[in-house]
Amino acid sequence: MDTELARTFLTVVASGSFVTAAERIHVSQSTVSTRIQTLEEQLGCILFVRNKAGTALTAAGRQFQRHASTLVRTVEQAKHDVGIPKGFSDTLVVGGRIGLWEEYLLHWLARMQAAHPRISIRAESALEQELMQGLVEGRIDIGVMYTPQSRPGLKVELLFEEQLVLASTSPGGMAEPGPGYVYVDWGPEFYARHSAVFPNFAGPALTANIGWLGLQHVLENGGAGFFARRIVEPLLRSKRLHVVSDAPVFSMPAYVVHSLDRQDDHVLGAIEIMRGVAAAQTMGADERKARVQRTRKIS
């Protein structure tokens, strides 16, 4: 079976639409339809039911989903195995949001290379949608993200709780969105909580889908936005940014996702190191919080 057909099938499943699937894999909608039709002819069954609400799997489609994932992952694993660089024993592809590469995954990377020097690592940055697709297809071994989706054959594990604080270039910043406020799109859950806390917020002049982009704009031009505390901590210490004390703090969990089929020592070892870095990071944050509280009591 052509793995391209299986990949197209999985993309339609993930997106819930032939149109969206075509956009994701950069082909026409008719090409997606033709590939699915060819696949259905080869399997001798109908895989999707299309209606106004989108595309839904049939019973046969749900059965084939597991096999399609296995097929694509097997091919990708074969590419990994035959493509191991000389001098290394194995390869590892790790993908994460750019905000999670900052501080957290970069610390993990240094520890991983020290602990497993014979593993060739490919580091990638992407948003959740692309990371999940890479995991389903087997192109990515480990994904680190904020809002993973439930997929057959994938394990999702909580790493740590991200704290999003309203940080401003002004020491007396407003406790709600005002002039110069940059809305960072941290995902649908953040949007829902943000809307509930700030019901009168009409909308931002600037929206950034990546925290790093919004942060650079604020530092360059002034303003405020909700950013991960662990990332802005050095900027808070240097007084380039200030936490708006009366503003709400949003908690956002960070997860590690990997295939249940991958039980290789280096994959499990990489995840164990991620747990260790997350634990150390959480402990450091708790210690900083305790110091601040002690300082407030003294003053």
Name these PLM-found stretches:
Residues P177-A205, N209-L215, Q281-R288:
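Secondary-structure junction motif
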Residues L10-S28:
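Short helix-boundary/capping micro-motifs
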Residues L127-L131, Y146, P199-P253, G284:
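Hydrophobic hinge/microswitch elements
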Residues H107-W108, Q129-L164, S168:
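Short beta-strand-centered segments that line the small-molecule binding cleft or hinge
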Residues A192, R229-S238, A247-S299:
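C-terminal effector-binding regulatory domain of bacterial HTH transcription factors
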Residues E40-L57:
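A short LG(V/I)-centered, amphipathic sequence patch enriched
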Residues V82-W101, A115-I119, E162-Q163:
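Interdomain hinge and pocket-entrance segments immediately C-terminal to HTH DNA-binding domains
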Residues G153-S195, P253-L260:
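Hydrophobic/proline-rich hinge and linker segments of small-molecule sensing/allosteric domains
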